[in-house]
Amino acid sequence: MAAHLSYGRVNLNVLREAVRRELREFLDKCAGSKAIVWDEYLTGPFGLIAQYSLLKEHEVEKMFTLKGSRLPAADVKNIIFLVRPRLELMDMIAENVLSEDRRGPTRDFHILFVPRRSLLCEQRLKDLGVLGSFIYREEYSLDLIPFDGDLLSMESESAFKECYLEGDQTSLYHAAKGLMTLQALYGTIPQIFGKGECARQVANMMVRMKREFTGSQNSVFPVFDNLLLLDRNVDLLTPLASQLTYEGLIDEIYGIQNSYVKLPPEKFAPKKQGGGGGKDLPTEAKKLQLNSAEELYAEIRDKNFNAVGSVLSKKAKIISAAFEERHNAKTVGEIKQFVSQLPHMQAARGSLANHTSIAELIKDVTTSEDFFDKLTVEQEFMSGIDTDKVNNYIEDCIAQKHPLIKVLRLVCLQSMCNSGLKQKVLDYYKREILQTYGYEHILTLNNLEKAGLLKAQTGGRNNYPTIRKTLRLWMDDVNEQNPTDISYVYSGYAPLSVRLAQLLSRPGWRSIEEVLRILPGPHFEERQPLPTGVQKKRQPGENRVTLVFFLGGVTFAEIAALRFLSQLEDGGTEYVIATTKLINGSSWLEALMEKPF
């Protein structure tokens, strides 16, 4: 059991156990000792559902990363390839199998595709002459991975690019399959709302899948009241802005991968007595797991960074007072009680030390002049100031050859806040970028245009002010310490995606029909009839539970905003978040960048 998955209204341990059971059953089918050959990308997501101890219990003795040529020597009966259905991986597998066949004693080969088998991949293995070598060729439907008690992700890094650039619906199919799995475990979701073309496709796929499985009536009592499917391209603006929550900033600066972050080690080195000892500083990055299993992290992760310092200093006083209690312990009983609390207190002290170090690292960035200048420009754009002309700060960034990703984020943000740039402004930016960073980046600029992130304003009309005012996307007075509105996550800007979720809950989307028509893609509502006997009756005062599924990625700041809404006393709705990928502005744009040869 992973305790942090079961704290919310929806116990996500049920899903984790279901996918673990499926994995155990496959491993047991391959009788005898085993080696797993991993597609490297899958090791992170797998770590969230099955640690090495589980694999070991089922006779997994060796683990290797999939590479071309020969496998390392392993005295095992079974070799299992655990891979995504990608053609380039099939070429490596074929090399491995052929070199093993030449090596001597025969092994049993198996392949487990995650999350689906692919006819194309099996054909490639056949063309390479190794398809017949596999005893089991199966799929492991790991569509949605539980990250936290209210958070699920498919961790499909190319989903946005596939959907919006390549017209490939594979990830939408996986999303629909994942939602069908959730409904099998947690009951039919009575109402589906959606906004966007991809949302419409996923809803259609779900209806079709449900028709195909009419034989089995779902008699599980529904846990979710609503499903909201949101296309990322309905709100392209939000991920481009700099996140200002604690967790969002950790991701922006260091990158959080599968709940882990790697940090500069020198901040975490134990303090030496008498100074000196600099040459003994650790050189390996400090790796920390970040989820709500850690009490302090759960408390500060969603706060605006400016509110984190006061929480940490308050915690320091409480912990220090708790340790002082040992001087007051006089009787054997009191000493015993203090000793029993010691492990928890020491863990709390370690946690505080880690987060104090992380906060210092972040503060070094957020107090820099460049961070302030960049944030000022972003906030001017989002509040509607000077969005229609070439920006001096962006010009300076290009002239000083700042990282290209930073420049692209700012230019795309300006484009989104002006419903596209004037043609001459767009041409100027493109020319400056290509001359400074290299003409090979023309492919990246084309991708950004195709995705709608960078565009020329058509018809001379800027719709952003209408959207901003109607949805209250910009708030001048933000209380970062004790927020009253979701705009605290960006210190003034309320994420459009989350505002849509909030307005759907109350008073409903009819109140914003005009804006919904301006935003891309259709908006719709579907009802799913519930089997008799499992109709949901809410208790007085009981909140609705809404699953918000972001198709194309979600940021930690948006997650924080939805958690804020869940905690409102009179909010009426608790949110569970699902997504194709956890993203920040840089990782999102990098997935759209064409790598120069």
Swiss-Prot record:
<dbReference type="GO" id="GO:0043473">
    <property type="term" value="P:pigmentation"/>
</dbReference>
<dbReference type="GO" id="GO:0005770">
    <property type="term" value="C:late endosome"/>
</dbReference>
<dbReference type="GO" id="GO:0030123">
    <property type="term" value="C:AP-3 adaptor complex"/>
</dbReference>
<dbReference type="InterPro" id="IPR027482">
    <property type="entry name" value="Sec1-like_dom2"/>
</dbReference>
<dbReference type="GO" id="GO:0030136">
    <property type="term" value="C:clathrin-coated vesicle"/>
</dbReference>
<dbReference type="GO" id="GO:0048471">
    <property type="term" value="C:perinuclear region of cytoplasm"/>
</dbReference>
<comment type="subunit">
    <text>Core component of at least two putative endosomal tethering complexes, the homotypic fusion and vacuole protein sorting (HOPS) complex and the class C core vacuole/endosome tethering (CORVET) complex. Their common core is composed of the class C Vps proteins VPS11, VPS16, VPS18 and VPS33A, which in HOPS further associates with VPS39 and VPS41 and in CORVET with VPS8 and TGFBRAP1. Interacts with RAB5C, UVRAG, STX17, MON1A and MON1B. Associates with adaptor protein complex 3 (AP-3) and clathrin. Interacts with PLEKHM1.</text>
</comment>
<dbReference type="GO" id="GO:0071439">
    <property type="term" value="C:clathrin complex"/>
</dbReference>
<keyword id="KW-0653">Protein transport</keyword>
<dbReference type="GO" id="GO:0006886">
    <property type="term" value="P:intracellular protein transport"/>
</dbReference>
<dbReference type="GO" id="GO:0030897">
    <property type="term" value="C:HOPS complex"/>
</dbReference>
<dbReference type="GO" id="GO:0048070">
    <property type="term" value="P:regulation of developmental pigmentation"/>
</dbReference>
<dbReference type="GO" id="GO:0016192">
    <property type="term" value="P:vesicle-mediated transport"/>
</dbReference>
<keyword id="KW-0967">Endosome</keyword>
<dbReference type="GO" id="GO:0035751">
    <property type="term" value="P:regulation of lysosomal lumen pH"/>
</dbReference>
<dbReference type="GO" id="GO:0033263">
    <property type="term" value="C:CORVET complex"/>
</dbReference>
<keyword id="KW-0472">Membrane</keyword>
<dbReference type="GO" id="GO:0032400">
    <property type="term" value="P:melanosome localization"/>
</dbReference>
<dbReference type="GO" id="GO:0030220">
    <property type="term" value="P:platelet formation"/>
</dbReference>
<dbReference type="InterPro" id="IPR001619">
    <property type="entry name" value="Sec1-like"/>
</dbReference>
<dbReference type="GO" id="GO:0008333">
    <property type="term" value="P:endosome to lysosome transport"/>
</dbReference>
<dbReference type="GO" id="GO:0097352">
    <property type="term" value="P:autophagosome maturation"/>
</dbReference>
<dbReference type="GO" id="GO:0005764">
    <property type="term" value="C:lysosome"/>
</dbReference>
<comment type="similarity">
    <text>Belongs to the STXBP/unc-18/SEC1 family.</text>
</comment>
<keyword id="KW-0813">Transport</keyword>
<dbReference type="GO" id="GO:0032418">
    <property type="term" value="P:lysosome localization"/>
</dbReference>
<dbReference type="Pfam" id="PF00995">
    <property type="entry name" value="Sec1"/>
</dbReference>
<dbReference type="GO" id="GO:0005776">
    <property type="term" value="C:autophagosome"/>
</dbReference>
<dbReference type="GO" id="GO:0044877">
    <property type="term" value="F:protein-containing complex binding"/>
</dbReference>
<protein>
    <recommendedName>
        <fullName>Vacuolar protein sorting-associated protein 33A</fullName>
    </recommendedName>
</protein>
<comment type="function">
    <text>Plays a role in vesicle-mediated protein trafficking to lysosomal compartments including the endocytic membrane transport and autophagic pathways. Believed to act as a core component of the putative HOPS and CORVET endosomal tethering complexes which are proposed to be involved in the Rab5-to-Rab7 endosome conversion probably implicating MON1A/B, and via binding SNAREs and SNARE complexes to mediate tethering and docking events during SNARE-mediated membrane fusion.</text>
</comment>
<dbReference type="GO" id="GO:0005769">
    <property type="term" value="C:early endosome"/>
</dbReference>
<dbReference type="GO" id="GO:0031902">
    <property type="term" value="C:late endosome membrane"/>
</dbReference>
<keyword id="KW-0968">Cytoplasmic vesicle</keyword>
<dbReference type="GO" id="GO:0005765">
    <property type="term" value="C:lysosomal membrane"/>
</dbReference>
<keyword id="KW-0458">Lysosome</keyword>
<dbReference type="InterPro" id="IPR043155">
    <property type="entry name" value="VPS33_dom3b"/>
</dbReference>
<dbReference type="InterPro" id="IPR043154">
    <property type="entry name" value="Sec-1-like_dom1"/>
</dbReference>
<dbReference type="InterPro" id="IPR036045">
    <property type="entry name" value="Sec1-like_sf"/>
</dbReference>
